[in-house]
Amino acid sequence: MAAIIYLAIAAVASILLFVAVKLLSTDTKTEIRTDDDVGELIGRENPVPQRPRARARRGLRNKTNRSKTQRQHDNDYDDYDDEYQDDGFLEEPVYDRKMGTKKLRKLEEKAEKKAMREQMEAEREDKINRQELREQNRRKEEERKAKEREEKEEAERKLKEEQEKREYEEYLRLKESFSVENEGSGEAEIAQESQSLLQEFIDYIKNNKVVLLEDVAAHFKLRTEDVINRIQTLQSMDRLTGVVDDRGKYIYISVEELNAIAKFIKQRGRVSISELAESSNSLINLQSDSKASHTIESVNDSPAEISVNA
């Protein structure tokens, strides 16, 4: 009998303990709920009749609150997106399944603007680089042309100096060949006499117009070869102009007469020696100051070719 009583007391204690645990669990869940959940729980336990208009206002208010919450969420996401995009962390838009169409379109527009901006910057840099390259090429071309001009001018200057030096040396040698030996004469007097003899040599040929080289050599007590060399030197110095035939005659022709002959040949085109000889009487004056006149035919009796040295 005592055992039965003991078992009954144990069963009652177990039931009381189970009920206490259930009540404690229910109280804990009730405390965690928010005020809205408590209100809803109370409303369900004690339903209070509400008017339709009040329910509409409350629904509109809840919808407005949800819209504000969504906009705030979008703004926060935009700020986050802009911050990382400006810092260069967001290279391409990250798509999410929960992302709306409007947000997706906005991200695509941002990506397109960024790509367009990068393309414009690349084109601008490329344009600047091309301009700099053209400017460098232009400066290099100007420097090259300037250097070529300087080199050409320097070469022409050196050539002119060498020619002048060579002509001057030839002139000195020519003067020395006409020097005379006079006892008691100074260097200045000898140089003056040499210059006088040189000018006399030139005037002798110009005045006679047509001279035999042997006669010139005999007149100035020179060898015929020396006379030829002196005439060639004077022609290179533009002190004499004329032609030498194969019979040892030198015909002096002035610059004006050479220009007239050149004009005649240019007007007629190609001309033969005989045609030139026929027209030379009217183009070249062969009258000498001390001798009788000569004709060009007397100089060109043979068909030998005449060389003109201008």
UniProtKB/Swiss-Prot annotation:
UniProt superkingdom: Eukaryota
Subcellular localization, as worded in the UniProt entry: Endoplasmic reticulum membrane
InterPro entries the UniProt entry points to: DDRGK_dom-contain, DDRGK_domain-containing, WH-like_DNA-bd_sf, WH_DNA-bd_sf
GO molecular function: ubiquitin-like protein ligase binding
UniProt feature, compositional bias: Basic residues: 52-70
Membrane topology: Single-pass membrane protein
SMART domains documented for this protein: DDRGK
Residue spans, topological domain Cytoplasmic: 22-310
Location of the region described as Disordered in the Swiss-Prot/TrEMBL record: 38-85, 110-162
Transmembrane spans: 1-21
Keyword Endoplasmic reticulum: yes
Keywords: Endoplasmic reticulum, Membrane, Transmembrane, Transmembrane helix, Ubl conjugation pathway
A Pfam family reported for this protein in Swiss-Prot or TrEMBL: DDRGK
Keyword Transcription: no
PANTHER family: DDRGK DOMAIN-CONTAINING PROTEIN 1
Family affiliation: Belongs to the DDRGK1 family.
Protein purpose: Substrate adapter for ufmylation, the covalent attachment of the ubiquitin-like modifier UFM1 to substrate proteins.
Name this polypeptide is given: DDRGK domain-containing protein 1
Organism: Trichoplax adhaerens
